């Protein structure tokens, strides 16, 4: 992608024009180019560019795009420090002010660079920071598949990979993109090994709490397979997660014994109870195609007058599909999502698909025999 230049002249003259412009705006910079070459000129121009950020947006973008265009023609080994310096200025300058301009400038730099240049990591992290500061994360690319590709293309170290994913996670949370944030956190935790899983203790703890707090999250068994989460075995947070994965209303006893712990997590008991009732109902619906109102009252610890309202709310989550039979005071289940999906569920899925395959073959053979007659 080409980046618009400040003026269509040689690099040296362009640097001189930039120096003169910045000088005219009050910057402490010489109008004469440095004898050290273009990269030294750019270092001094970037250092003094604060003054132009105060100008009209169109002028600023033109000037800064000129800086970007000069940066992009430097040798890669001379680019990195200068790009880091420019990014730092754009992230920190009057933090919170003129976010759309700063995003545009960083985006121009990011998309103007070679796709495999490792220093794009710095620019992308800066984009995330600025977008998060103004609630504009939707205006930058955050799709997990694309981020994975960049991590590979840039050949990031493990530390930088973790930094990027953690930064992206926090930005998505701040911008209330909970579904995307959860996927990024799972990606982050999944990137740890047994050797460094202990380093992700805080992230694992945060991931569990956010998942339990999310009103639209009901399946948690995948979290138990993550190495940093396994590292928390024996702690209350892991016990709580295990209850939400497969237990019924064992949560009630856990809460009675650990009320202060639940409160310290910022979790609300009533919301936890509502979620546990739904999870318990999902488990019941997997095992039974018909469930009496009396059984539901007993298992879910709800009153007779609350059964129908509970079922309606459960169906709205799309985790359970069922009908209410008021005459016989029962619920007829057509489908329920499994709370855990292990070897047994994979076998059931295989058997179902295999049965469909055999039935389709029978239909095919029947049609072929009819066409032959």
From Swiss-Prot:
Coiled coil: none annotated. The modification Phosphoserine is found at residues 2, 152, 366. This is Eukaryotic translation initiation factor 3 subunit M. GO terms for cellular component: eukaryotic 43S preinitiation complex; eukaryotic 48S preinitiation complex; eukaryotic translation initiation factor 3 complex; eukaryotic translation initiation factor 3 complex, eIF3m. Component of the eukaryotic translation initiation factor 3 (eIF-3) complex, which is composed of 13 subunits: EIF3A, EIF3B, EIF3C, EIF3D, EIF3E, EIF3F, EIF3G, EIF3H, EIF3I, EIF3J, EIF3K, EIF3L and EIF3M. The eIF-3 complex appears to include 3 stable modules: module A is composed of EIF3A, EIF3B, EIF3G and EIF3I; module B is composed of EIF3F, EIF3H, and EIF3M; and module C is composed of EIF3C, EIF3D, EIF3E, EIF3K and EIF3L. EIF3C of module C binds EIF3B of module A and EIF3H of module B, thereby linking the three modules. EIF3J is a labile subunit that binds to the eIF-3 complex via EIF3B. GO terms for biological process: cytoplasmic translational initiation; formation of cytoplasmic translation initiation complex. The modification N6-acetyllysine is found at residue 253. It is found in: Cytoplasm. Residues 180-338 form the PCI domain. Component of the eukaryotic translation initiation factor 3 (eIF-3) complex, which is required for several steps in the initiation of protein synthesis. The eIF-3 complex associates with the 40S ribosome and facilitates the recruitment of eIF-1, eIF-1A, eIF-2:GTP:methionyl-tRNAi and eIF-5 to form the 43S pre-initiation complex (43S PIC). The eIF-3 complex stimulates mRNA recruitment to the 43S PIC and scanning of the mRNA for AUG recognition. It comes from the Eukaryota. Disulfide bonds: none annotated. The modification N-acetylserine is found at residue 2. One of its GO terms (molecular function) is translation initiation factor activity. Belongs to the eIF-3 subunit M family. Keywords: Acetylation, Cytoplasm, Initiation factor, Phosphoprotein, Protein biosynthesis.
């Amino acid at each position: 992608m080409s980046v618009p230049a400040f003026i269509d002249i040689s690099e040296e003259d362009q640097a001189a024009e930039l120096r003169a412009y910045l000088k005219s705006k009050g910057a402490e910079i010489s109008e004469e180019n440095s004898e050290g070459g273009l990269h030294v000129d750019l270092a001094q121009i970037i250092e003094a560019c604060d003054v132009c950020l105060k100008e009209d947006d169109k002028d600023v973008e033109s000037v800064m795009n000129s800086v970007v265009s000069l940066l992009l023609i430097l040798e890669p080994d001379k680019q990195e420090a200068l790009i880091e310096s420019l990014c730092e200025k754009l992230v920190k300058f009057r933090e919170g002010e003129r976010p759309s301009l700063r995003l545009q400038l960083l985006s121009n730099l990011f998309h103007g660079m070679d796709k495999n240049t490792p220093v794009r990591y710095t620019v992308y992290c800066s984009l995330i920071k600025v977008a998060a500061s103004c609630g504009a994360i939707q205006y930058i690319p955050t799709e997990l598949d694309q981020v994975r590709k960049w991590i590979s293309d840039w050949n990031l170290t493990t530390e930088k990979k973790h930094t990027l994913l953690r930064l992206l996670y926090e930005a998505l949370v701040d911008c209330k993109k909970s579904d995307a944030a959860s996927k990024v956190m799972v990606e982050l935790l999944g990137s740890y090994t047994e050797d460094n899983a202990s380093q992700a203790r805080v992230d694992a703890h945060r991931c569990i709490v956010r998942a339990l707090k999310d009103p639209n999250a009901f399946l948690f068994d995948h979290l138990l397979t993550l190495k940093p989460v396994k590292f928390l075995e024996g702690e209350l947070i892991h016990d709580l997660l295990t209850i939400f994965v497969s237990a019924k209303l064992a949560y009630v006893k856990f809460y009675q014994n650990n009320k202060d712990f639940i409160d310290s997590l910022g979790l609300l008991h009533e919301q936890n109870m509502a979620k546990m009732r739904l999870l318990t109902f999902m488990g019941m619906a997997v095992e039974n195609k018909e469930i009496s109102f009396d059984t539901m009252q007993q298992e879910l610890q709800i009153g007779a007058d609350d059964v129908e309202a509970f079922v309606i709310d459960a169906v709205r989550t799309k985790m359970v599909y069922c009908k209410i039979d008021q005459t016989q005071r029962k619920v007829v289940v057509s489908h329920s999502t499994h709370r855990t999906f292990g070897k047994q569920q994979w076998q059931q899925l295989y058997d179902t698909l295999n049965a469909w395959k055999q039935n389709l073959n029978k239909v095919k053979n029947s049609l072929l025999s009819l066409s032959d007659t």
